[in-house]
Amino acid sequence: MFKQIILFSFLLCSAQFFAQDEEESTSKFCVEIDNKKALKLYEKAIDKKKYKKPERLAFLRECLEIEPDFAEANLAMAREIIVHCKLESKPFAPAVPFLLKAIAVCPKIHSEPYYYIGFNFYEETKNDSAIKYLQQFVKFKDDDDKKYAKEYEGQLYQAKEMIKYAKKESELKKKIVPFAPKVVTGVSTKTDEYLAYISPDDKLCFFTRKVPLKSMNTVKAIDGERELFMVANRDNTGVFNSGEAMSPPFNTTEDNQGGCTISIDNKFLYFAMSRFEGGSQPNCDIYVSQNDEDTWSEISKIGANVNHPVYWDSQPTLSSDGNTLYFASDRPGGYGGIDIYITKKDPKTKIWGVPQNAGPKINTDGNEKTPFIHSDSETLYFSSDGHFGFGGMDIFLIRKNDKGEWIEAENIGYPINTEVDDVGFFVSTDSKTGYFFSYDEGKMRGKGIGKYDLYSFELYKEARPQETTFLKGEIKDNSGNNIEGAKVEITNTVTKEKTLAVVDSSTGKFMVAVNLKKKDDLLLTVKKDDYSFSSKVISVKDASFKNEPTPVKIEINEAKEGSSFVLNNLYYTTNSADLTKESFIVLESFAEYLKENPNIKIEIQGHTDNIGVVKSNEALSANRAYTVKAFLEEKGVSGKNITAKGYGPNKPIAANTNEEGRSKNRRTEILIISK
């Protein structure tokens, strides 16, 4: 993007140079020329009134054959070439040898040769040479005003900009990052595959494949081929099969479908689709389909709030909790041509809100597209030609700080990024593998199977998102029945950050992405109207949690008068009524529950095992119950709705003959008095 901007500015700033006659130059030659024939030929070559361009060029060529070190003749030849190249919109590299000869013979001949030589090297991405000559242009000093173009100030500004960006690019290229891409077999074939995406569980790969039109008569693509929306499965050895066309309602019309994202439970597929809706051009919007027992529901638009009725909306990527969607759009009101937008879903109504621009940390006056939000929920990858890069679209990453604010976008580095467009990048859930699709005749020359293929590589550590795994579980009642329509809230016990799990409303099964960098314990709280409070603390410190965490089972029952439940993970210091810090988060969550259900009246019951004196245990259990009552009142729960009582060892729920039974008996129980 920067090169294009500077090139355009160059065309504007160079007009005076092209219009400038050689007669305006200093009348004295830098080096005395004794050859009269060469002098005569030069005089003819600069006489634009008498001779046409072909004749002048012939005079210059003959002049330089006689006197190759004739500085002014070399400069005149360079000017003629530059004028021609400008008119033909071609690089003016052919003029560089003449400019170099001119300044080699006469360094002070004119300021502009340094500018054009530097610009040419800048355009060719020969940054060291570009910096060298552009700096000479900036430092050029002479009392003769004729040695400066009328547009010198504009050229000076452009030269300084080119120096700045050339230095930045050189610094980026010196920091070469590890990059050893290999083609993803199975998915990649001799035909084109692109717009790929691998599901968060790493088992499914969605992509678009071009196939010969032949016996097909729908979903046409250019070159007599058809675009199919495909899905491939990964086997136990980690290899994808070649894939098959997505079943109906996909691939049934001429509407192009692809560029998708899917919820972590593989149930909700969001994708872009381009279709004609009455206008002369197809409109690209974001759609959704739900999977129920391997059957996809009818396709529907994500919502009127999200899709613009006229402009392009595409390339969705979904957060791990399923409630935030990032996408690219060229709608008006942004920072540039294509911007990244964010829309959030109301957990209650399930309606997507009005999209908000992702802001200037991400979007520029250029174009930003193909966003990918990792399951860690704090690392976003996207492609941009507005942030500083190597040329075309480069891949960038940006992270959130502890306050949830975006920090600064970083170029992912060379040679992952090159002078060509680098787009469609995403990262595996475990953070270790990067994926992208690329044209084999570009930077992947010779490594592909077809033209456009999917590639993978080990992503270097500094560019990785936070390592993430998925915690799964299910909600049941005390009879083992599935609970429908419940919510599962996950709270970090240290930061208090809250996340909603993705819950299957019909089965009660849930799934949530867990950031493994934060080794803090997690509090899982189940919420459902007219049901009792239920929570469980999960430790992520165990090494086995990294791979496939054991599914969590949480029990929740109807909140009936006379029913009771245990407050799990509530601990006190030994022989004391003082709560441990780990218990605070549980009681804070319980306080929220009581405030959300202000009509419930409870009795807090303290219980102990049978070790020790009965009277002492009764007193200890009562003190603990009152400690809980005081904590809840401090958090805003009405004291009128709470009573507290200690029962000591008198109401065991397990045998006191072993430690396992005794630990169950040491508990804080909640009795629902009325609701």
Question: Model-predicted segments: where are they?
Answer:
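TPR-adjacent "capping" and linker segments in tetratricopeptide-repeat scaffold/adaptor proteins
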Residues: 21-40, 106
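Short, conserved micro-motifs composed of acidic
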Residues: 30-36, 109-112, 116, 123, ...
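Alpha-helical segment of the N-proximal tetratricopeptide repeat
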Residues: 34-66, 82-90
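Short coil turns that delineate tetratricopeptide repeat
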Residues: 68, 107-108, 142, 598
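Periplasmic OmpA-like peptidoglycan-binding domain that tethers envelope proteins to the cell wall
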Residues: 384, 388-389, 597, 605-675
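Periplasmic peptidoglycan-binding/tethering modules of Gram-negative envelope proteins
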Residues: 462-489, 493-601, 675
